Amino acid sequence: MAVTAFNTLKLVSSSLDPIPSVSCSSYSFSLIYVGSPYKRCLKQSCSVRAMTSSSSAASSSSSSFGSRMEESIRKTVTENTVVIYSKTWCSYCTEVKTLFKRLGVQPLVVELDQLGPQGPQLQKVLERLTGQHTVPNVFVCGKHIGGCTDTVKLNRKGDLELMLAEANGKNGQS
């Protein structure tokens, strides 16, 4: 197992053979963190932009596969200061990861292309939650800030560092 400069989130499945539909309730999964030294975002009231489900099948059963994925995403982005949903081969993802490294921030990176069949499913749920179908999909303190272009713009304006400083200040108060 190669060690990278970024922590990754691994998805472990139980009894997932073919890729099921997102709303199938007979499948389950669990998220396992691998070395997560991040400060937790104390702002529990942070909301992720467009966090509504457009799928009536997924919202009709709270125990459905898609609903559990949505819940896991929400939990992940609110419990970690910076989360990047990425793909290892994507140059835009690399640019965003490098930007946070330059800022002295070690984000939680979820490499969707290394999650097997759950990667595309997770990306579909992210699209439903955020309206964004591309990677990187970046969250700061539970708030969806967008992709590479959005993140770079926030950094150029100085807003990204302000968001990170605010998050660190709140984490330091505990």
UniProtKB/Swiss-Prot annotation:
Reported induction: Up-regulated by cold treatment.
Keywords: Acetylation, Chloroplast, Disulfide bond, Electron transport, Glutathionylation, Plastid, Redox-active center, Transit peptide, Transport
Impact noted for substituting residue 141 to S: No effect on Fe-S cluster incorporation or on glutaredoxin activity
Binding site for glutathione: 135, 148-149
Keyword Acetylation listed: yes
GO BP: any one term: iron-sulfur cluster assembly
S-glutathionyl cysteine: modified positions: 90, 148
UniProt effect for mutating residue 93 to S: Loss of Fe-S cluster incorporation, but increased glutaredoxin activity
Regions that span the bilayer: none
Effect of residue 148 to S: No effect on Fe-S cluster incorporation or on glutaredoxin activity
Record PTM: Glutathionylated.
UniProt-listed PROSITE patterns: GLUTAREDOXIN_2
Superkingdom of this protein's organism: Eukaryota
Chief subcellular location: plastid
Disulfide pattern: 90-93
CDD domains: GRX_GRXh_1_2_like
Range annotated as the organelle transit peptide: 1-51
Outcome after substituting residue 90 to S: Loss of Fe-S cluster incorporation and loss of glutaredoxin activity
Modified residues (N-acetylthreonine): 52
Pfam families: Glutaredoxin (PF00462)
Cellular component per GO, a single term: chloroplast
Cell compartment(s), UniProt: Plastid, Chloroplast
Quaternary structure note: Monomeric apoprotein and homodimeric holoprotein containing a [2Fe-2S] cluster. No in vitro interactions with SUFE1, BOLA1, BOLA2 or BOLA4.
Function according to Swiss-Prot or TrEMBL: Has a glutathione-disulfide oxidoreductase activity in the presence of NADPH and glutathione reductase. Reduces low molecular weight disulfides and proteins. Can assemble a [2Fe-2S] cluster, but cannot transfer it to an apoferredoxin.
UniProt xrefs under NCBIfam families: GRX_euk
Name this polypeptide is given: Glutaredoxin-C5, chloroplastic
Source organism (scientific name): Arabidopsis thaliana
